Amino acid sequence: MNNLWRGQIIDVDLEPTRGSETGKVRPCIIVTNDVYNARVPVIQVVPITEWNEKKARISTNIDLEPSAMNGLTKRSIADCLQTRPIDHQQRLVRVRGQLSAEDLARVDGAIKQVFGFS
């Protein structure tokens, strides 16, 4: 099993999808806690998509700037409404990097809003 950690950005093959689900191979943020990440193959991720002005206006979409730490190559959006479980043993393509603590805190806040925890 891979050593995966909360806040890592990994490339994931999200196909097949249905309806309006986010698809393709794309970066995703691991949001499950590290106990689950170490013990089970199914983890929860937030897909990352290309930035655009319309998506940036949605309160549960988090703006991410590229950095050497996170491994992103362009300005992006963490689409917290599209949070989903994946089996990383089947869908993981590669590890890109790690979110900063500040960006992970913003993602946490958006997830709380999506699930009604705030």
Q: What is the predicted role of each segment?
A:
Residues 1-118:
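Conserved functional hotspots at enzyme active or ligand-binding sites that engage polyanionic ligands
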